[in-house]
Amino acid sequence: MASPSCASTLPWTAAAFSYPRRLQTRRAPSLVIVAQGRVKKYRQVILKDDIDEISGKKGDTMKVRAGFYRNFLLPKGKATLLTPDVLKEMQLEQERIEAEKKRVKEEAQQLARVFETIGAFKVPRKGGKGKQIFGSVTAQDLVDIIKSQLNRDVDKRLVEVPEIREVGEYVAEIKLHPDVTAKVRLTVYTK
């Protein structure tokens, strides 16, 4: 057996562990994980641009995969998520656009009534023998007459004039709106 003096020098002897020590352990802070349930695979989005990949046009609401939205549409700024606030804003914008379209159509109808109540625009031309005139009456001629008599600007591309090469009465059409076409009477005479 070992001598008592020896026992005090060896750390592994029973003398070194005569009283039980409490082991100190440090605990890491606990991380609480809460399950979110199933992740939505699709997202409702409003397109800001025309997108060929999904055959969508600006302003359309579409259902797209979450990854496509997160990785392609969102970084490029081509779509926003459809939320109740965005939906309400979109409806207000749609109502404003519809009111503007209605106002433009009413103005076009009013202008068409003005053109039809005027009677006939008189177009002077230099004439030849009989009913023949020199040159022809073009859309630009009609636009100039309307501007001088009514102080209204009309785009000549919207005016459809039949081929006029003789003195007489003619009817021209002015497309003021996709739904409104005004018929204008022309009286061509020689000077």
From Swiss-Prot:
Taxonomic placement: Eukaryota, Viridiplantae, Streptophyta, Embryophyta, Tracheophyta
InterPro entries: Ribosomal_bL9, Ribosomal_bL9/RNase_H1_N, Ribosomal_bL9_bac/chp, Ribosomal_bL9_C, Ribosomal_bL9_C_sf, Ribosomal_bL9_N, Ribosomal_bL9_N_sf
Main localization category: plastid
Subunit structure, interactors included: Part of the 50S ribosomal subunit.
A single BP term in Gene Ontology: translation
Segments crossing the lipid bilayer: none
Lipid metabolism in keyword set: no
Keywords: Chloroplast, Plastid, Ribonucleoprotein, Ribosomal protein, RNA-binding, rRNA-binding, Transit peptide
Family: Belongs to the bacterial ribosomal protein bL9 family.
MF term (GO), any: rRNA binding
NCBIfam families (alphabetical): L9
Function field: Binds to the 23S rRNA.
Protein name, as recorded: Large ribosomal subunit protein bL9c
Location of the transit peptide in the chain: 1-35
PROSITE patterns: RIBOSOMAL_L9
Entry superkingdom: Eukaryota
UniProt subcellular location: Plastid, Chloroplast
GO cellular component: chloroplast; mitochondrion; ribonucleoprotein complex; ribosome
